[in-house]
Amino acid sequence: MSKTLYQKIYDSHVVYKDKSNMSILYIDLHLIHEVTSPQAFDSLRHKKRGVRQPQKTFATMDHNVSTQSKNINASGSMAQKQMEQLIKNCNEFNISLYDVNNPNQGIVHVIAPEKGMTLPGMTIVCGDSHTSTHGAFGALSFGIGTSEVEHVLATQTLKQKRFKNMKITIIGKVPEFITAKDIILFIIGQLGSSRGTGYVIEFFGDVINNMSMEERMTLCNMAIEMGAKSGLIAPDEITYSYLKNKIYSPYGIFWKKAIDYWSTLKSDKNAYFDKFFTIDISNLAPQITWGTNPDQVISIDEKIPNHNKFDSSIIRDSIKSACKYMGLKEGTYLTDVSVDKVFIGSCTNARIEDLRSASKILKNKKISKNVKAIVVPGSGSVKEQAEKEGLDKIFINAGFEWRLPGCSMCLGMNNDRLNFGERCASXSNRNFEGRQGRGGRTH
């Protein structure tokens, strides 16, 4: 029977299956951070349980950390307590922790791939919705809740139903200056933020085949913004090249065996997909969100839509509501709208290729004195590499602040945030109301 990549990985990890559509899956890698794990560890203590396989669990501090200093008190008392609790929990249960003083510390979805923890064919979970990032390697990866974090810690398994399969094929020649972020925003805009609900999305096409691993991670990172359980891309030579000689990657004779297995991780020719779409990006222009949902997105040369042009009352009301919150008028070009802050960072766009691309645009240029701009590398390793290449100097000379690794202004959980009414051009993945701070406006 022909299978999709998702079905192959799912089926190979089933340890128990009931008569319904539910199975217990073995989990290969469990990633944790300071925000969604404290209650899970407290519950383990209360029930007098241990962590079943601590060597398959890795922790980092990212959501709450200050990117201005390594002081865990800098982001407030709640953040301090969560980080102190993570240190305590990892010490007690013998879990590897990348804390703020570790040179490899960074955003969980940046450090796991760059260290080779993320491998094709794995099942990977984390108490974070953008765990779908790791699907770029052909790994079944998805976010889980705190009660599920506890279950994985205690059993190294997770109860999961089988999701449907969606195939998205991207065709056309990629226009100059168009990035993976533009492509995924365009797809979300075309298909909607709920089209992927109940599905695992696999991406296909020559556009995908020619993408670097960092571009593929951006694509899969935002599959969740379509409502999908996860995003997947089959591993290939680009994947193998990226993973070779990483700290946690197989080596020696195990490397060849790994390649032999990884080469089987692709959807069969006649595999059945419940839904499929073909997206042509030949004429794609740079994309930017104007509203409060990732599917409220337009090309940079388009106007904010007029609600009267839509038949659906839901869409009309959504446009009016979003414009009111964002302080925008329908029919406006976003190129005519000024911003207060600029943020380059997040698990979507804080890798070395992202920083190289941004630095090329900023070289020998200066930002407005009225704009505060920050660059936050996704990890200590990214920061170190960028500084070796002199990228930090380009950003600083342009007027940006060069920061320490962390989630930073992607979300208002640390001391990098928008003030009420401030507008930000952001490289992050969500433009929800208040995402970057109460009353903040995100593009």
Swiss-Prot record:
Binding site for [4Fe-4S] cluster: 347, 407, 410
Catalytic function, reaction form: (2R,3S)-3-isopropylmalate = (2S)-2-isopropylmalate
Protein's organism: Buchnera aphidicola subsp. Uroleucon erigeronensis
Keyword terms, alphabetized: 4Fe-4S, Amino-acid biosynthesis, Branched-chain amino acid biosynthesis, Iron, Iron-sulfur, Leucine biosynthesis, Lyase, Metal-binding, Plasmid
PANTHER family: 3-ISOPROPYLMALATE DEHYDRATASE, HOMOACONITASE, MITOCHONDRIAL-RELATED
Keyword field contains Aminoacyl-tRNA synthetase: no
Family: Belongs to the aconitase/IPM isomerase family. LeuC type 1 subfamily.
Subunit comment: Heterodimer of LeuC and LeuD.
Protein role: Catalyzes the isomerization between 2-isopropylmalate and 3-isopropylmalate, via the formation of 2-isopropylmaleate.
UniProt feature coiled coil, ranges: none
E.C. numbers: 4.2.1.33
Record protein name field: 3-isopropylmalate dehydratase large subunit
Cofactor note as given: Binds 1 [4Fe-4S] cluster per subunit.
Top EC class for this record: lyase
NCBIfam families: leuC, PRK05478.1, PRK12466.1
Protein origin, superkingdom: Bacteria
One Gene Ontology MF term: 4 iron, 4 sulfur cluster binding
